[in-house]
Amino acid sequence: MTTMPAQRANGAPTFKALLLAASALLPGAGWAGHALAADAPAAALAPDNADAAAVDALVVTARYRSEDVQTVPIPITALGGQQLEALGGTFNLKQLMQQLPSLNIQGFSGRNQTTTIRGIGTNAGGTNDGLEQGVGLYIDGVYRPRTGTAITDLVDVESIQLLRGPQGTLFGKNTVAGAIDIRTREPSFTPEWRGEVSVGNYKYLRAYGSYSGPITDNLAIRFSYLRNEREGLYYNTVYKKRWDNLDNNAYRLDLLYKPTDDFKLRVTADYSIQKGNMGFNVVTAVLPTTKANGSVVRGFYEKAASVGYTPLAIDPFARKIDLDNSQFDRMPSWGVQSRADWQVGGFTLSSISAYRDWRWIPNYDGDQIGANVSTQGIVDTVQTQFSQELRLVSPDERRLQYTAGLYYFWQEADDWTTSAYGRDAAKWLLGATYPDAVLNGLASVAHVVPATHSYAAYGQATWNLRPDLRLTAGLRYTYEEKTGLYDAKVGGSAVAIADLPTAWQALAITARATYAPVSRYEADWNGDNVSGLLSASYDLSDDAHAYASYSRGYKSAGINLVRQTTGVDIFVAPEKVDDYELGVKTRLLDRRLELNANLFWTTDENYQANYVNTTVSPAVTYIANTGTLRSRGVELDARAAPFSGLTATLSASYNEARYQSYKNASAQYLTSYQGVKDLSGAEASGAPRWTVAATLRYAKPITLAGGDGGEAYIGGDYSHRSHFFAAVNDDIFSLVPGYQVFGLNGGVRSDKGWDVSIWARNLFDEEYFNTLSVNATYGIVQGTLGEPRTFGATLRIKR
């Protein structure tokens, strides 16, 4: 791309300039493409080509056909197994986010993870089980509704594809923002085994082993085991030990039965458990005590003094914490799934069945500081799900190609929420003169049970009008039923009211009713929707393809299963998304350069977001509709092989995400959360304006000792994200600064199957935040930190 966007005085390109720059690719690509060579044979999903100065074709299966990614009229970023290995020290999707622009994952625990694409999805905040996810996560075709899956270890990954925009006519579960499609390696009838050991600083150890081979002539097996451990990245000054450690194990058993060329059955069972002293926030700043109107409130240091607590110095990147109560996370997960594929007359009929069980067993320090205010804040969760999908894919190479499917999904979560209060709670929360016994030992215990039944029929057809022109239409019908139970009671071992001094009894009754309210209700909802897709794609030449599309996405209504307070509605209206895409995909310079660009314009009506009601104590996290959100921008994907051995990739996104209509936003901290604020026209939360990811790799054939062939290689990666607001009300104290991270790796690979490398992530030890939250109750800003510099070595063996 030779045309540079016009710049503002401060260096930020205007939206109009970006549109013009991206649009300029269309005619240029059409002119250049006619002079290029004919299509080369497609290769398997692979990120580079060290043997020739040309970019390998990327073959993706997003539409359930093996297709050259350049001809698929969808904005896709794909990572292959070799590219994942080259990143070094990377083991989960949250870390891979750095290489997937437009994707943003925030959170601090296995349960509280939120995901957005282009600013649309689920914003940061306490996870609410009554809220559907806007980004679909699929592993081998099975939908994973729990966002905590994003931070678990990835095993046997063959490819990861990020599809942007609504995908309801392709996938079983409807999604409004896009989909993350993860595919794993099938069992092989040729015996093979893989082994990997990585060691690094912070006592990092990752050991992986996998064997695959035939049991009989038509039955193959793959068994894999992964161990991942690391000491903590933070030092707890109270417990005198390091926290935020990893203690993970994952097992996977895969069977492939293939009696004929026309039928195969794959059955997979997996189990993983993640453990550690993790899931906490650090204090990043102290909130001012003087508000915008000049009023003064009790601040963090005054409250701390009232209970005899001496806080640590505010220095988040010293990575010191003083949590004084036990904190741990246990996250076991297991599942069984089967996929049967029949091929009859060129048609493929697939059946995908899956049952999964996910549990979150935490014990959290409720206040996340060294005072004994909230001694416990947990949501013990058991989530189970079942899904069944039937899908028919028509033969390739026909004038009309189509996919049609039926889908059923059920999930239920069984949550037990506990908030317990300690000896400092009364003085901190109520006033310095209150006796400790007013709240000490009090606990609020709530049983929350949301359940969903989802039924859908979907289809998508492509009509090849001419060899160079295709029209695609898709339609989806969704019907969903939701139920919910919320049952809160008083628990704990607080002193009886009658045993308190008479002067405090009335105040204690009010305080306990506030912090441990009794409430019970049930709710149910049902509704349906029709959504769809229209697109056209045109071959400007053999090596240049343009497309335009419109799609409607839908996310069903939500149920607020929280303590009911003023302003909190039980039901949240469904979310509807209209998405427009205009893109071009090109191969240039005799296939040494692959350059793709697309413009997007997305309008999200009734955007569902996490709110925090801080006008009540304790604060209540709930979901509500913000109004209308608009996301528009430009995305760029490029791969290049300038000369033999050198490969480069670049993915970049400019996203202007704003609230178009948001007149009733929660007020911000400096206004004491009084009233509402009109944020119409303001930046949407969780949406960095700029995201960039780039990699560079050079490999050179060498002769090893003993005469064996091999190659030496070196590579680097770069990621940048600009600032964004973490809070839905754009509170200035939730502004997450932009950051950039570099990685480096290099090694030697033998033709005999071994590979030894060294690597570093966050090479220059960039200090950055993943997310920030405003905690007015404690008078502080809390956040989660990006990982510090990590480095190590890896040995891989493949046979």
Regions found by a protein language model. Name each.
Residues 339-364, 539-555, 571-634, 639-641, ...:
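Membrane-embedded beta-barrel scaffold of Gram-negative outer-membrane proteins
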Residues 402, 467, 471, 596, ...:
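Gram-negative outer-membrane beta-barrel transporters
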Residues 4, 603, 719-727, 748-799:
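C-terminal beta-signal and adjacent terminal beta-strands/loops
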Residues 132-134, 146, 155-164, 169-237, ...:
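Outer-membrane beta-barrel translocator/receptor signature
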Residues 233-242, 279-322, 365-376, 418-447, ...:
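Solvent-exposed loop segments that connect transmembrane elements
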Residues 1-90, 94-99, 261-262, 336, ...:
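N-terminal Sec signal peptide and the immediately downstream disordered periplasmic leader
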Residues 53-190, 582:
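Acidic, small-polar-rich N-terminal luminal/periplasmic segments of exported/outer-membrane proteins
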Residues 127-131, 187-192, 216-218, 262, ...:
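Short loop/turn motifs that connect adjacent beta-strands in outer-membrane beta-barrel proteins
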